[in-house]
Amino acid sequence: MKKMNYLLPEESGEMTLSGITTLRKIEQKLRNLFESQNYQEVMPPNFEYVELYTGLDAGFEQEKMFQFINHEGKSIALRYDFTVPLARNFALSELTEARYSYFGKVFRKEKRHKGRRTESYQVGTELLGLSEVTGDQEILGLTFMSLEALTLKNTIVEIGSAAFYKRLCELSGGDAQLFSELLEKKSLSGMKAFVDKHEMIGAPRDLLLALMTTTDLPTMKKLVLATGDEKLSQALEMLEALNLPDKTAICQIHYDFAMVPAMGYYTGLMFQVYVEGVAQATISGGRYDKLLKQFGKTTGSIGFCVHMDNVVKGLNND
């Protein structure tokens, strides 16, 4: 008789019984919270046409999708992302404003040594139809309430701007890919070599060298003002309009001016929440106004995602 192989494939995600119990408890807390804030739970399909993701200017990597051919000969992918299907549904509706919540898994091919899961469980919200500052403040407020419900300790909320990042890339001397990699790695020595290579001097040089070490808005505003760049100033003005404190009762709030967008469709505010002892973000979110335009609807949109596997890790570390 052939010997059975009982090993799980690398792509599988598995959780202990105690982990499942913890997950279900916090899942219910978040569901109750979202319902209390009028976020309607929706359940997008597990399968989508590959073209839904690749046909958008959203930075999706097709090689990370789990794909197969259906009975009609069309390319299908396991759910790669929640935001895109929900944005599509909203754009095709007659609604002018919507609040959605979701609970489910996404599937992306990831290398295990990077600490990311190929099969990950996500809980999240999408707010569609509100203007930038109003929508940003509501989603950040809901994020803080979610942190309180999760009872995570020693949390840091990092605030960034996709508009700020994209303008920096435009000013990077035609070497945007390397520039982005340096930001993502937080490589101070690499950035020093970068500005030397491009012979940057004065205010632009000072700005780039300060990106990874500056965590307060007033200091960064002075550095940007010295460059005279209007787009960079506008991006910081949007962050300033949020009027965020340095900390709340449940978390510290830092600015990360070197933050690289986790999703290619982000256009404005970005944020990530980290908890002590967990390398990856427990919550991530951002504004994605241009995504809806690709579906023919022009309005504000922002959301966030709770990475439940990382939350369970954080709670186990407490």
Curated annotation (Swiss-Prot):
Q: Which Pfam families does its entry note?
A: tRNA-synt_His
Name the source's superkingdom. Answer: Bacteria
Primary residence: cytoplasm
The record's Gene3D superfamilies line, in alphabetical order, gives: Bira Bifunctional Protein, Domain 2
**Keywords tagged on the record:** Amino-acid biosynthesis, Cytoplasm, Histidine biosynthesis
A molecular function GO annotation: histidine-tRNA ligase activity
Q: Where in the cell is it found?
A: Cytoplasm
List the InterPro entries hit by this protein, alphabetically. aa-tRNA-synth_II, aa-tRNA-synth_II/BPL/LPL, HisRS-like_core, HisRS/HisZ, HisZ
Q: Which GO terms describe its biological process?
A: histidyl-tRNA aminoacylation; L-histidine biosynthetic process
GO CC annotation terms, alphabetical: cytoplasm
| Entry keyword annotation includes Protein transport | no
Which PROSITE patterns does the UniProt entry name for this protein?
A: AA_TRNA_LIGASE_II
User: Which pathway, per its entry?
Assistant: Amino-acid biosynthesis; L-histidine biosynthesis; L-histidine from 5-phospho-alpha-D-ribose 1-diphosphate: step 1/9
- Further notes on this entry? This function is generally fulfilled by the C-terminal part of HisG, which is missing in some bacteria such as this one.
Quaternary structure note: Heteromultimer composed of HisG and HisZ subunits.
What exactly does this protein do?
Answer: Required for the first step of histidine biosynthesis. May allow the feedback regulation of ATP phosphoribosyltransferase activity by histidine.
Which family, according to UniProt?
Answer: Belongs to the class-II aminoacyl-tRNA synthetase family. HisZ subfamily.
Indicate what this protein is called per its UniProt record. Answer: ATP phosphoribosyltransferase regulatory subunit
Q: Which organism is it from?
A: Lactococcus lactis subsp. cremoris (strain MG1363)
Upper classification of the organism: Bacteria, Bacillati, Bacillota, Bacilli, Lactobacillales
